[in-house]
């Protein structure tokens, strides 16, 4: 049972960490597109391993051909964007191996992308990985868990309508 459901008895949606690492506030992402919430509210992960997992049961709306980002639609309608690293589109897909394609149904904690974090670092790019809920405005309550180490088995975002 989530924090909001315990407190208010409301239905909530829970989203799990897409990667293992330290969960940080979206405002700490060194890219204004994410830090200023232009794409929605969320969290970011400073990853310690190169595996990207589905944060919930969802459909793959768009797996970018380069593998640097994936857009999902949760079974409850949340629009989720996971962007692996910053400016990583410039790597033309080299450090990424994709395990899902557009239209696929995925389950919570299902592997979506393998990424070579060392290759991203060697290119001088950040590995910080934002996960944002693009339709944040559809929810009355938005709770994030940041400032601690997480795995794909930890809830990092809870939403209530």
List each model region and its residues.
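Contiguous, well-folded functional domains in the mature portion of proteins
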Residues: 1-161
């Amino acid at each position: 049972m989530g924090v909001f459901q315990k407190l208010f008895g409301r239905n909530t949606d829970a989203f799990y960490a897409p990667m293992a690492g330290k969960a940080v506030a979206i405002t700490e992402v060194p890219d204004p597109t994410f830090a200023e919430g232009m794409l929605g509210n969320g969290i970011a992960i400073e990853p310690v391993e190169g595996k990207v997992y589905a944060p919930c049961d969802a459909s793959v709306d768009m797996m970018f051909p380069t593998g640097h980002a994936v857009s999902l639609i949760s079974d409850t309608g949340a629009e989720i964007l996971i962007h692996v690293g910053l400016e990583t589109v410039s790597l033309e897909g080299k450090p990424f191996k994709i395990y899902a394609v557009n239209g696929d149904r995925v389950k919570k904690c299902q592997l979506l992308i393998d990424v070579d974090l060392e290759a991203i670092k060697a290119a001088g790019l950040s590995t910080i990985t934002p996960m944002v809920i693009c339709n944040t405005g559809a929810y009355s309550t938005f709770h994030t868990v940041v400032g601690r180490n997480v795995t794909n088995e930890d809830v990092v975002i809870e939403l209530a309508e």
